[in-house]
């Protein structure tokens, strides 16, 4: 569920059309022959290309990153289904426009173009060679121990948005952006996650304090119905759970699966704290 400049696995490409599926049919044929790939499906090749991208981010242009971002989203999500980002989110608007421009493009076409783009970037890439992988997870944000399910990317300074600075715990940058109104403290990413969700997910207690001082919506729910309290509980940050409760977080709000914050944690201390607080408010 991830959202920074590239989703986990996105690679580079060319927004000028050089990497269209029609122009690169030769590349695709070489990938899909039984001799070269055995029984690998197009989807498996796409996943391998996505894994390979992590080592190519630094050599890719902004246009290439946007090209691949859009196709990754088309494969994983489908047609663009999110509102256009606000005026101040310049990078977010570029990403949204690149994705939106694909219209009703099929996942198959998007995968073909994505794979061809990776081949253009690294002609020597061999998808039969396994990529080194970090922590993996099936659902990303919103599941147990959220951070462990989120793949980090290397993002160049000029490509960062407010959520990237939040991940990095860059309190000064975030405070200045909010104070100057360059960013709204309650702005959300495409998954409905606000800055407070991100800060709680990463365990950045001091940043959580700053966001609350700027009146972050403490009970704001993401697209899965999870609050910042769900995130802090799932990641087992007891001190942040305490801070949120002291600041007025509602432990009775349930996510779309019907789970309370106390039910998404594997930490007994966190669960007991939430239960006691909820009981005291009953």
Curated annotation (Swiss-Prot):
Region (Disordered): 1-39
Subcellular location: Cytoplasm; Nucleus
Record-listed Phosphoserine modification sites: 41, 106
Positions annotated as ANK repeat: 191-220, 224-253
UniProt keywords, alphabetically: ANK repeat, Cytoplasm, Lipid-binding, Nucleus, Phosphoprotein, Repeat
Binding-site residues for an acyl-CoA, renumbered to this chain: 69-73, 95, 114
Gene Ontology CC annotations of this record: cytoplasm; nucleus
InterPro entries: Acyl-CoA-binding_protein, Acyl-CoA-binding_sf, Ankyrin_rpt, Ankyrin_rpt-contain_sf, FERM/acyl-CoA-bd_prot_sf
ACB domain ranges (all copies): 42-127
GO MF entry, a single one: fatty-acyl-CoA binding
SUPFAM superfamilies: Acyl-CoA binding protein, Ankyrin repeat
SMART domains, sorted: ANK
Subunit note: Monomer.
Function: Binds long-chain acyl-coenzyme A molecules with a strong preference for unsaturated C18:1-CoA, lower affinity for unsaturated C20:4-CoA, and very weak affinity for saturated C16:0-CoA. Does not bind fatty acids. Plays a role in protein N-myristoylation.
PANTHER family for the chain: ACYL-COA-BINDING DOMAIN-CONTAINING PROTEIN 6 (PTHR24119:SF0)
The name this protein goes by in its record: Acyl-CoA-binding domain-containing protein 6
Organism: Mus musculus
Encoding gene (name): Acbd6
């Amino acid at each position: 569920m991830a959202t920074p400049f590239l989703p986990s696995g996105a690679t580079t490409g060319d927004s000028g059309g050089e990497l269209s599926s029609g122009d690169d049919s030769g590349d695709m044929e070489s990938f899909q022959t039984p001799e070269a790939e055995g029984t690998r499906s197009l989807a498996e090749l796409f996943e391998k290309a996505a894994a390979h991208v992590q080592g190519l981010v630094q050599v890719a242009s902004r246009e290439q990153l946007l090209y691949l971002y859009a196709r990754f989203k088309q494969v994983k999500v489908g047609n663009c289904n999110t509102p256009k980002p606000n005026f101040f989110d310049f990078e977010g608007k570029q990403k949204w426009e690149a994705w939106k421009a694909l219209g009703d493009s099929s996942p198959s076409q998007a995968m073909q173009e994505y794979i061809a783009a990776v081949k253009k970037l690294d002609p020597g890439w061999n998808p039969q060679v396994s990529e080194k992988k970090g922590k993996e997870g099936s659902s990303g944000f919103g599941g147990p121990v959220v951070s462990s399910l989120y793949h980090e990317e290397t993002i160049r300074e000029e490509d960062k948005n407010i959520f990237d600075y939040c991940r990095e715990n860059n309190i000064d940058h975030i405070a200045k952006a909010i104070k100057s109104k360059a960013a709204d403290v309650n702005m959300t990413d495409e998954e409905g996650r606000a800055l407070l969700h991100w800060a709680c997910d990463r365990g950045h207690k001091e940043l959580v304090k700053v966001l609350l001082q700027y009146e972050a919506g403490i009970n704001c729910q993401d697209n899965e119905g999870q609050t910042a309290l769900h995130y802090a509980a799932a990641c087992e940050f007891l001190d942040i759970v305490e801070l949120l409760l002291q600041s007025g977080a509602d432990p009775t709000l349930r996510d779309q699966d019907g789970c309370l914050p106390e039910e998404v944690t594997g930490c007994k201390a966190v669960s007991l704290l939430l239960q006691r607080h909820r009981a005291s408010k009953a």
